[in-house]
Amino acid sequence: MDLFFAYMLVASATPLFLWLEHRKIALTSIPFIIIMWVLALSHMFEGFLFDLHHSVFLTAFFVNVIIAHFAALVLYAYPHIRPKSRTFTESMD
């Protein structure tokens, strides 16, 4: 559960990084973050999850993993790839 909790903190911060430039991605991730935290807190206080709750928690967690990795790609890799692709297309003309 420690790994889940550590990643949940990182996933919760993802919309903050995306808010200014990519608001649609940030708004898409917010419902999954809320679901993930509600189910994680219910698991911590009740001590167990039923099969459906467990499946929904893992689904929300993995959707947040995908959104966070996409956000990292958009924020950090895309600015470096974009100038190279422009020079490549300009050289083709």
Swiss-Prot record:
It is a multi-pass membrane protein. It is found in: Spore membrane; Spore outer membrane; Cell membrane. Keywords: Cell membrane, Germination, Membrane, Transmembrane, Transmembrane helix. Pfam families: YwcE. InterPro entries: Spore_morphogenesis_YwcE. The chain crosses the membrane at residues 1-21, 30-50, 56-76. One of its GO terms (cellular component) is plasma membrane. Its main location: membrane. Belongs to the YwcE family. Required for proper spore morphogenesis. Important for spore germination. This is Spore morphogenesis and germination protein YwcE. The gene is ywcE.
